[in-house]
Structure formats: C-alpha cells, structure tokens
C-alpha cells in the first residue's frame, strides 16, 4: 500500500485546514498545531479509530453568517461544530467540520487574559469533543465535557481554561 493510500493512524488525525480569503494569517496557528490539538482531544475521549475533519478559520462576517444560518443567532461565535452526517451503515473516519472565528477567538483571549495560542487550542479541543457527540447543555454533560477538555489541554501544557 502506498503512503497516499494508507489510512491515517488514530494518533495522526487527518486535518484539512483552510482560512477565509483575505483573512490575515497573523495570530492564526499553523496546521501542525491544529493537528496536535485534535490529537489531544481524540486521546482524551479515548477515540482510537482513524479520524478526519476540516477546520475553517473565518473572519467576523463569515462567522456571523454561519451562526445566523445554522443556529439562527445574529452574531459571530468562537467555534461552530458540524458533525458528519453519514448514511446508516456507512463507517468512515470523517468526524465533520469546525468553524473557528479568528477575531472572536482573539478578542476572547485578550478579555480572558489568555495566550492566543492557548485559546485556539481550547476552542479546537472543545469543537472536536462536540464532533464526537459531547455537549454542555445539561450540567452533568458539561462537567464531563469540561473534564475531557482539561485532560486534553493538560497534555498540551495549556492551563485549565475554567480555573
């Protein structure tokens, strides 16, 4: 089997990273950082299967449009998660898509006194956990999800975002 045909190992998720046209690369982490953050989230959730997802980093206008269209909320938010919807019986490594709004992530990091890179790590881990089916609507679910976030971020040397 050639390298191009090989399925990525669970420890090496396939991450497709894109940035909105015209969005400055300043402050937006590189692809290897996103892969490490995805890998940490998958490890914390004990997902061992191969995984593939897309991450799109957007500006305020695009972030607002996504949130308005899919959540009926007229503002840009930090991260949106779109789990893959596969037909019954189809098993692919595709987890789904994450949308990260760069200006919102940057503003929140500044307001919360966090390093920008650490906040990107947190939002990526948070989004991946949503793709895996975790949520934070009910308190017990939120506690479980936050515990997994802390575990993943600790592996990355990122301080507890909830402390």
Role assignments for model-derived ranges:
Residues 123:
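Extended, folded domain segments that form the structural surfaces/walls around functional sites
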Residues 1-120, 131-163:
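An acidic/histidine-cluster motif and surrounding catalytic segment
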């Amino acid at each position: 089997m050639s390298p191009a045909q090989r399925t990525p190992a669970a420890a090496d998720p396939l991450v497709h990273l894109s940035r909105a046209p015209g969005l400055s690369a300043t402050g937006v982490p590189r692809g290897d950082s996103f892969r490490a953050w995805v890998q940490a989230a998958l490890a914390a959730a004990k997902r061992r299967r191969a995984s593939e997802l897309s991450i799109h980093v957007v500006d305020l206008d695009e972030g607002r449009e996504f949130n308005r269209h899919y959540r009926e909320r007229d503002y840009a938010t930090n991260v949106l998660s779109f789990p893959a919807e596969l037909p019954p019986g189809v098993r692919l490594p595709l987890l789904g898509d994450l949308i990260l709004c760069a200006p919102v992530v940057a503003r929140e990091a500044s307001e919360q006194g966090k390093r920008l890179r650490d906040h990107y790590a947190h939002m990526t881990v948070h989004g991946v956990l949503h793709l895996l089916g975790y949520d934070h609507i009910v308190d017990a679910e939120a506690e479980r999800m936050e515990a997994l976030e802390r575990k993943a971020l600790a592996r990355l040397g990122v301080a507890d975002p909830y402390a």
